[in-house]
């Protein structure tokens, strides 16, 4: 970071009154023992778990909103199923971050949480994949609504959201620990994380777009589980293997130094943990410097923009481009598969952008890059609205397949959105890790603070997007319009309010 930025942060720290903290020893920031700089290869292996996490997340994003509608939940309420994601992020992510900052396990602070999260992910996707079979075993039969299968699905879905938050946060915190507040190394590590997210997305969306898994895993098709269900189940079997491989690669690469359980700090530690946690995460807000609040504001606006797309991307393709409905004909499932293909191409662009991230931020400044990416996101959402409008007036819906030009436009928009998505997955985490270090927070808790700016908007979108869309006659365009507006505003704020610092070319990493 440039000298002027360092001086600014030091002045804020010097003029700020001391942060009031509980008297318990657990509230004191955890300081890791000094270590030598880790190599890029180690950072790469540690970040690899993001590939396994994102593989399952890609399946979740591309297939589960359509699938839950096939189980009988109306489109207007499908977004409510996703409510657990932001709710678990609101509570689980900060709690896990706080706990991992103070974990005294002999295996390290972060790795136990990564492994536990990976196990929970594996269990949850098995429950989701077998939801129809579980529902059948407990009395579901043929019908439009399968209530017992829905209960099993929602249970597995919510466990999956909790597990994703339990795994991803400690992994990012571990990368921050290993880079030891080196600005460039932090950006590089987050770039690696985004790169592996892109690889996981490509593989996950490719898996979700293939309709022949039930022919390979023939046992997955049952009396309760049709072809679409069997393909989903098969994809999750692959996910379990993939998450196991990447978790082993990640945790075996990081050599964490366990925290010493000092007898002098033992007194009162267990009794004051919750109080200290709440005090740290909320009590420090008023001491944040202005640029931290700008980062949190832009993050919130960005995610109000992204979440409607994340919820309904393949559903938008199936309904508004292919003109289908769940459980009626083949148009909807064909649209979902094409949407998954578009998301796979999206992930290719995400990966390319992740590789170029460091150079872009060094040349133009992280705030400027973030702002431009948000404006690009808003333009793409506007393009989706225009494409839906044109498709609805061509007269093919309900009679024939969409014209190639409409499909091409939709897939192109999905693809281009990979560029701003890569920025969203990387730049805010790097900025927040660097800028609030002076507050004395551990990396796990600092990322939990940023997570609040992500999940609160997601709660709002999850609750409001379905009724909001119905207010304007259904479809996904109203929520996308809100996303375009907030994304554009966030981009302007980032460009104008975040320092456009150009970083000098650094010495190559070892």
Swiss-Prot record:
Keywords: Cell membrane, Membrane, Phosphoprotein, Sugar transport, Symport, Transmembrane, Transmembrane helix, Transport
Ranges where the record places region Disordered: 1-34
Job of this protein: Responsible for the transport of sucrose into the cell, with the concomitant uptake of protons (symport system). Can also transport maltose at a lesser rate. May also transport biotin.
Catalytic activity: sucrose(out) + H(+)(out) = sucrose(in) + H(+)(in)
Pathway(s) served: Glycan biosynthesis; sucrose metabolism
Annotated protein name in UniProt: Sucrose transport protein SUC4
A GO-annotated cellular component: plant-type vacuole membrane
Membrane topology summary: Multi-pass membrane protein
Ranges of compositional bias, category Low complexity: 21-34
Molecular function as annotated in GO: sucrose transmembrane transporter activity; symporter activity
Regions of this protein lying in the Cytoplasmic compartment: 1-45, 93-111, 170-187, 255-291, 357-365, 424-443, 499-510
Source organism per UniProt: Arabidopsis thaliana
Positions of modified residues (Phosphoserine): 23
Complex formation: Homodimer. Interacts with SUC2 and SUC3.
Record-linked CDD domains: MFS_SLC45_SUC
One GO BP annotation of this record: sucrose metabolic process
A Pfam family per the record: MFS_2
Tissue specificity of this protein: Expressed in sink tissues, mostly in minor veins of sink leaves. Localized in companion cells.
Transmembrane region(s): 46-66, 72-92, 112-132, 149-169, 188-208, 234-254, 292-312, 336-356, 366-386, 403-423, 444-464, 478-498
InterPro entries linked: MFS_trans_sf (IPR036259), Suc_symporter_pln (IPR005989)
Family assignment from sequence similarity: Belongs to the glycoside-pentoside-hexuronide (GPH) cation symporter transporter (TC 2.A.2.4) family.
